[in-house]
Amino acid sequence: PQMLSANERLKNNFNILYNQIRQYPAYYFKVASNVPTYSDICQFFSVMYQGFQIVNHSGDVFIHACRENPQSKGDFVGDKFHISIAREQVPLAFQILSGLLFSEDSPIDKWKITDMNRVSQQSRVGIGAQFTLYVKSDQECSQYSALLLHKIRQFIMCLESNLLRSKIAP
C-alpha cells in the first residue's frame, strides 16, 4: 500500500481531528521571564538561553533558536509559519513575542528571526516574513496528534493577539 503524505492524512482525517480538537479546553502558555532583547540576540554569536541554543553567525541574515531537548520527537516535514512585521517594529515585536517563543510550554522547538541589521531593506526578508516558526509532528510517519494541533493553534492565536493588542503592524 502507498504511504500517504502528512498533508493527505490531515485532509482525510479532517473531521475526526476537528472534533477532537474542539473538545480540548483553551491552553494557557507560561511566559518565560528575563528574556533577551532583540538587541541582545543580534549581538550573540552562540548562547544557550532557557533551553534554546541561539545562534547568530555572520554568514546568515537570520538568528536561529533551537530547543536543546525538543518536545516534539517527530520529523520536520516542511511545516512552518511566517510572521511578517513592519521592518521598524521588529525589535518591539520580538519583545512582545519572546516570552512565548522561549516558553517551556511552547510547541515550537525551532524558530528564527531576521537580523534586520544584516539584511537589505528591499530583500524579501527585509520587507516581510521576519519570524519563521518550524513545526514538527509528534507521532510516527510525520503525523500530528489532535492535541498538538490544538496546542499549535492556541499558540499562534496567542502570538497574533499579543501583536494586535500592542498595535504591531504587519
Swiss-Prot record:
InterPro entries named among the record's database cross-references: OspF/SpvC, OspF/SpvC_sf
Signal peptide location: none
A GO MF term: lyase activity
EC nos: 4.2.3.-
Residues at the catalytic site: 82 (proton donor), 112 (proton acceptor)
GO cellular component: extracellular region
Keyword line: Lyase, Plasmid, Secreted, Virulence
Coiled coil: none
Known role: Catalyzes the removal of the phosphate group from the phosphothreonine in the mitogen-activated protein kinases such as MAPK2/ERK2, MAPK3/ERK1, MAPK8 and MAPK14 in an irreversible reaction, thus preventing the downstream phosphorylation of histone H3. This epigenetic modification results in inhibition of the transcription of a specific subset of pro-inflammatory genes, and ultimately to a reduced immune response against the invading pathogen. The diminished immune response enhances the bacterium's ability to disseminate and multiply within the host.
Protein family (similarity comment): Belongs to the phosphothreonine lyase family.
Entry protein name: Phosphothreonine lyase OspF
Taxonomic placement: Bacteria, Pseudomonadati, Pseudomonadota, Gammaproteobacteria, Enterobacterales
